[in-house]
């Protein structure tokens, strides 16, 4: 989906490189925005309950950069040359992995929104990272190293900037196939407009590893409504292909039908995997999807463990809760 463009149009590869450098330059401000959003959301979330037998089981790991000194187990560390951090076993096993689509299609912003899809997806990912870290969780990008502590979100931001500079657009548009640990969760941020025959194998590869998945579909409102009228030139963001419509409004009904069909097919796949879908439009506040996503990660007992919906209930994957 793309707005009308000038006749002189840079190649997709050049656009990707230019946008990657621009994204790296904007990352500090996006990180600030994400922390502001996460603090707003945190005020609306009640304290977590940490109950159950898992609290009595502990395991140790080496102290990492970004860990607080308060987490060091000094008794265990005294008998070694290393500093050790003590973690509850259920906390250590629970890692939330994230992935953000950084392909060219995510650069789209229409006149109906103040934020490109890419910026909003990054802000959502960083803000979610902050909330998870505040809850004691381990977070990381798929293919990276999960972390806890104050520096975890900074590492996610750094990883996103590096991947924007180094990844090809083909790599950027689909979730990676990196191995993940069982009992973890994965949150994917994208417009998810890729053909399902390309996307579905990637989702299945993650699901068979025993992880629970949550998809956040980030769309510009114009991608839902196709508000253009009259003679309009459209450009495919990732291929550079162009199409001129004499009366853009005449395409609206068929376009909307294809969007609905694509989303319904995606939802069918997610029902099969017992994963969830959340639709977010960039003209809406970022706090809205974060509250919903946090509730889904919290599950029924507010311990951040995903609970699949009851049989016959599809609220977790219905776009009716679109934010």
Regions found by a protein language model. Give the residues of each.
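Conserved AdoMet
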Residues: 70
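Short, Gly/Ser/Thr-enriched beta-strand-loop segments that form substrate-interacting elements
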Residues: 73
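Exposed, interaction-prone extracellular/peripheral surfaces
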Residues: 1-49, 57, 62-67, 76, ...
């Amino acid at each position: 989906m793309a707005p009308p463009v000038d006749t002189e149009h840079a190649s997709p590869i050049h656009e990707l490189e230019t946008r990657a450098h621009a994204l790296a330059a904007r990352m500090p401000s996006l990180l600030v925005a994400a922390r502001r959003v996460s603090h707003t959301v945190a005020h609306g979330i009640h304290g977590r309950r940490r109950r159950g037998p898992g609290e009595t089981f502990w395991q140790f790991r080496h102290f990492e950069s970004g860990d607080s000194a308060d987490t060091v187990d000094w008794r265990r560390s005294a008998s070694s040359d290393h500093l050790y951090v003590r973690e509850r076993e259920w906390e250590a096993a629970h890692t939330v992995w994230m992935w953000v689509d950084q392909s060219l299609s995510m650069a789209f912003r229409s006149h109906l929104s103040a934020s490109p899809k890419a910026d909003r997806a990054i802000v959502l990912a960083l803000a979610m990272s902050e909330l998870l870290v505040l809850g004691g969780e381990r977070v990381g990008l798929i293919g990276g190293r999960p972390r806890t502590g104050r520096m975890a979100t900074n590492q996610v931001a750094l990883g996103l900037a590096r991947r924007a500079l180094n990844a090809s657009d083909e790599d950027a548009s689909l979730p990676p196939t990196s191995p993940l640990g069982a009992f973890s969760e994965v949150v994917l941020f994208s417009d998810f407009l890729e053909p399902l025959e390309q996307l579905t194998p990637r989702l299945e590869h993650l699901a068979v590893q025993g992880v629970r998945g949550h998809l956040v579909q980030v769309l510009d409102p114009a991608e839902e409504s196709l508000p253009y009228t009259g003679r309009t030139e459209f450009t495919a963001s990732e291929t550079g292909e162009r199409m001129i419509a004499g009366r853009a409004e005449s395409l609206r009904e068929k376009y909307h039908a294809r969007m609905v069909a694509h989303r319904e097919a995606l939802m069918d796949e997610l029902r099969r995997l017992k994963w969830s879908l959340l639709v977010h439009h960039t003209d809406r506040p970022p706090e809205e999807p974060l509250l919903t996503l946090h509730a889904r990660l919290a599950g029924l007992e507010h311990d951040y463990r995903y609970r699949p919906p009851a049989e016959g209930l599809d609220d977790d994957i219905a776009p009716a809760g679109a934010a």
